[in-house]
């Protein structure tokens, strides 16, 4: 399906699964201080203490707390943090529309110091500039270094090589002012459909609104959606669909029929009317058939999308196989998607591997510690990529009083993961630390986590 890059979310995922306890006491004091809204001086003292101890997780917490005011903190640790301070300062500049050359310079420095996440960032910047050849150079470096987001983007882009070459050709003409009207329409449509860059597509196509050119109207509708003008956007989607059954408009209408009305049959009719074989439509048809319990048709459409190398559809097909209890097929398709950089597939694959381990060694099923070495290896990689849910799950591979349970859940809690707050409550409960256990249970509960009757009673003692 269409590639969606959730920039802020992804870029914040820079947490190392450290094997030592350096700086975690100070990190925890900072976290508690932030949650309890303690004074700035206390929080900064502990953030600095954690950074000076070599803790790598503290920079993400500092970024969240300091936001646009983080320059002084990050500058202090440049050339001292394996490129992490440079990375977060680049992120801060990007969020505040800072100088692009400075951002790229910081990221290049971060990459040279071993921060492989910077390769993904640099590649993403060049993608947004429609310089895909350059983007792929950096994404390949990230892929080769084992960075999973770079791997996913590199593999995704590879499937669109011919389209991206054409975009680069047309964009050069556009920038030189030598592009024809038809070429301009082609460029804007490609940027819209293959890059999903609605702002840039609209800038290119806005001159064609007066002639009701479907891609230009669609780009306008997406920007209206972004401004919370849902009704106006849907009105345009209906207009475009009635006009020429434009597949992107059909998807927007079908997805709303499913989400708001659960009208799967009408949604399917809307998609059928487009006669489109785009992976977005094929994959969504599979999803609708799955909800209609027509698993044969669902698999057929997922496979059609997968034949076009759509990674998202691999995940959906894996879920379908799980529903059908065909775990061998689910495992195989998740493994394929994971090898192409899908974090969600890796997560699901780890669950299957753990279940297989339990079947092999039923005598260990009463042991609360998870056992699969293969699953643990996957979760370690995902944790190192910054996925907080994987950090929480990885902590289950250690004895409940092990220091890694605390470290992994602190790293996830710094991202405000509610399960991590609960797990820290349990950890300190087992350590007989009433103050901290009650604190974390309260935070978990305040953030919507069901801590259960026993711990609800415990925090009110």
Per-range role (PLM):
Residues 31-32, 64, 91, 124, ...:
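Residue-level recognition of tetratricopeptide repeat
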Residues 61, 88, 121, 153, ...:
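Canonical tetratricopeptide repeat
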Residues 94, 127, 159, 192-193, ...:
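Position-specific recognition of the canonical hydrophobic site in helix A of tetratricopeptide repeat
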Residues 15-16:
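C-terminal motif of bacterial Sec signal peptides marking the signal peptidase cleavage site
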Residues 47, 74, 107, 139, ...:
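Hydrophobic/aromatic packing residues within the alpha-helices of TPR/SEL1-like helical repeat arrays
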Residues 53-56, 80-83, 113-115, 145-148, ...:
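Short helix-capping/linker turns of helical repeat alpha-solenoids
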Residues 37-38, 97-98, 130, 162, ...:
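Residue-level detector of the short coil/turn that links helix A to helix B
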Residues 43, 70, 74, 103, ...:
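Single-residue signature of alpha-solenoid repeat helices
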């Amino acid at each position: 399906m269409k590639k969606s890059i959730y920039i802020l979310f992804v870029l914040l995922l820079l947490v190392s699964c450290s094997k030592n306890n350096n700086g975690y006491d100070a990190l925890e004091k900072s976290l508690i201080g932030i949650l309890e809204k303690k004074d700035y001086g206390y929080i900064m003292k502990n953030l600095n203490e954690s950074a000076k101890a070599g803790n790598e997780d503290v920079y993400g917490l500092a970024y969240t707390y300091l936001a646009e005011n983080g320059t002084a903190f990050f500058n202090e640790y440049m050339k001292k943090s394996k490129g992490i301070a440079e990375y977060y300062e680049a992120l801060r500049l990007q969020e505040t529309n800072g100088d692009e050359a400075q951002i790229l310079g910081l990221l290049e420095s971060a990459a040279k110091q071993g921060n492989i996440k910077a390769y993904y960032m640099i590649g993403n910047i060049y993608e947004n500039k429609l310089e895909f050849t350059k983007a792929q150079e950096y994404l390949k470096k990230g892929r080769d270094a084992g960075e999973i987001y770079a791997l996913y983007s590199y593999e995704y882009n590879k499937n669109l090589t011919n389209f991206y070459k054409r975009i680069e050709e047309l964009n050069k003409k556009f920038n030189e002012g030598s592009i024809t009207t038809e070429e301009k329409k082609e460029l804007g449509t490609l940027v819209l459909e293959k890059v999903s860059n609605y702002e840039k597509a609209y800038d290119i196509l806005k001159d064609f609104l007066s002639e009701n050119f479907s891609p230009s109207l669609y780009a306008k509708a997406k920007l209206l959606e972004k401004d919370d003008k849902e009704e106006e956007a849907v009105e345009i989607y209906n207009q475009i669909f009635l006009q020429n059954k434009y597949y992107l408009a059909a998807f927007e209408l079908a997805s709303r029929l499913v989400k708001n009305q659960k009208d799967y049959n009408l949604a399917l009719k809307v998609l059928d009317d487009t006669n489109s074989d785009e992976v977005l439509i094929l994959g969504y048809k599979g999803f609708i058939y799955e909800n209609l319990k027509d698993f044969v048709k669902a698999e057929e459409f997922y496979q059609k999308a997968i034949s076009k190398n759509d990674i998202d559809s691999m995940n959906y097909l894996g879920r379908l196989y799980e529903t059908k209890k065909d775990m061998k097929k689910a495992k195989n398709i998740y493994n394929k998607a994971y090898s192409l950089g899908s974090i969600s597939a890796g997560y699901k694959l780890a669950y299957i591997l753990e279940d297989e381990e339990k079947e092999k060694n039923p005598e260990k099923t009463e042991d609360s510690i998870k056992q699969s070495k293969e699953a643990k290896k996957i979760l370690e990689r995902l944790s190192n990529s910054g996925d907080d849910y994987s950090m929480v799950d990885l902590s289950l591979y250690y004895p409940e009083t092990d220091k890694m349970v605390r470290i992994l859940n602190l790293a996830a809690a710094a991202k405000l993961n509610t399960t991590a707050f609960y797990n820290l409550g349990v950890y300190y409960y087992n350590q007989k630390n009433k103050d901290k256990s009650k604190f974390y249970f309260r935070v978990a509960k305040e953030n919507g986590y069901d801590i259960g009757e026993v711990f609800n009673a415990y925090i009110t003692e």
